[in-house]
Amino acid sequence: MKILIAVGSKEYSGPTLQVGIKVAKAFNASTTIVDVGEKVSEFSTKVVGLTQERMESWDFDRPGVDVLEWAFKYLAENNFIEPQQIEAGFPKTTLVEKDGRRAEVYLKGTVCDDVNLILRNGDIIAELRDEVQTEFYDVMIIGGSGKRRMVHDMIQYIDSSIFVVKNYDPSQEYQIL
């Protein structure tokens, strides 16, 4: 089973990540955590590429890497990744670019073999739909956004089972989890 956990920020995605990890552990599922950043204009793609190269030489992180680093720390605190990787720290230097819109970090999991952190850029719905279609996820776990329209659009346009985490209280016991 393959699970995609969509996070958007450190401030609001904690419950989504917590539930996603619990579900992944329960099913021993291959897990991917994705953050979709703002869309980069076609006119500025080359400039953004040059800027990212320059940022690397200056030791700046590209937008969204902080969210992936936060997810990595959460995975480490919950022993979801191998101890050797935890000791080495977040591997931002091994962020693999797959096209102009997708970068990925591969991790070795303790509960399952594959744990990936993905950073995509573009329209949230289109990028998540593309990720689900190309990687064949069985379940996508998303947070209950304050924007009802966005959750509705995801459910309508993404061809995957969708688990919506809304009003999750980590101190409460849930029968399903």
Report the location of each language-model feature.
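A structural micro-motif
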Residues: 29, 113, 160-161
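Conserved phosphate-coordination/catalytic loops
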Residues: 11, 62, 119-123
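Structural beta-alpha unit
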Residues: 73-140
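Small/aliphatic-rich secondary-structure junction motif
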Residues: 1-61, 76, 83, 157, ...
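Gly/Ser-rich helix-loop-strand patches that form or flank binding pockets
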Residues: 17, 117-174
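Short, surface-exposed alpha-helical segments at coil->helix boundaries
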Residues: 57, 61-72, 100
